[in-house]
Amino acid sequence: MEWQTRFSPLNLSTQDALPELSISLLDNLGMITMVGDDKKSYLHGQVTCDVVSLEKDQSMLGAHCDAKGKVWSVFRLFHHNDGYAMVQPKSAIEVELKEIKKYAVFSKVTIEESSDIVLGVAGENADAFISTLNADSGEVRTVEGGTAVKVASNRWLLALTAEAAQSLLEDSQATLTTHELWTRFDIEAALPYVAADAQNEHIPQALNVQALGGISFTKGCYTGQETVARAKYRGTNKRAMYIVKGATAEALGEGAIELERSVGENWRSVGALLTHYQFSDNQAMGLIVLPNNLDDDTRLRLVTQPECEWEIAALPYSLDDE
């Protein structure tokens, strides 16, 4: 679509001010939608969050697991059109769609990948901008061609038809940028990002889903519940997701970015970043799952750039269950 060429990368240093209003084309994200008479009961029985309690003007995070409690997807759930929408990394959807539909034949529900465009609106003028589309006070609002969803202070997702997205941008004075800026905001908020290469690797608590209100321990049965409950009540989970940051000698590539941690005089692999953001002044940040007993001052380094040491940064929330 020609209008999408208006979005361009925004190269920012660690010292640069952020735009007062930016709209990011989130082509790295997609949506699974669910409609039908049984949508609520079916989804409630598949995921970690309390779907039944979700109000029309709210969104929530949740996870979908396999029978062993390993995560297929972490998503943001909200009411959209006549059903639900689950926003998540686009690369995860092929597998997640197959898994979430596995038992749907027994229910009156239609589950499919949405063709809607996902945009991210951010900046100190974001709330005012959304209010021009719908002046209601809710954190989820119906707008022309779709839905607006508040995800944080001064940050909104827009799920729109292509026609509505194009119309919205025709006279916009916002900075139009690609998805990397939104990724930065998600990293700073420590919001889990489970792309295809991280599926079926971690339980929800290792991705901090419980700390973000994405696990209900009172809702009843769902796929993988036994493992998730055991991690809480028996303390079997030994991992958590952290923000890490440090210097780069050269730009980080798009492939797996592996880190090592210091162990005495040696270095030991700790895994790959779930996602990352590259600043223009040779600094970067990312999210990674690490052992949850590491000291805050544990030394880390990039495997491919061993001269570049990284550190663990503070999370913006407690890891306790909410």
From Swiss-Prot:
Coiled coil: none annotated. InterPro entries: GcvT/YgfZ_C, tRNA-modifying_YgfZ, YgfZ/GcvT, YgfZ/GcvT_CS, YgfZ_barrel. GO terms for biological process: iron-sulfur cluster assembly; RNA modification; tRNA processing. Pfam families: YgfZ_barrel. It comes from the Bacteria. Keywords: Cytoplasm, Folate-binding, tRNA processing. It is found in: Cytoplasm. Folate-binding protein involved in regulating the level of ATP-DnaA and in the modification of some tRNAs. It is probably a key factor in regulatory networks that act via tRNA modification, such as initiation of chromosomal replication. This is tRNA-modifying protein YgfZ.
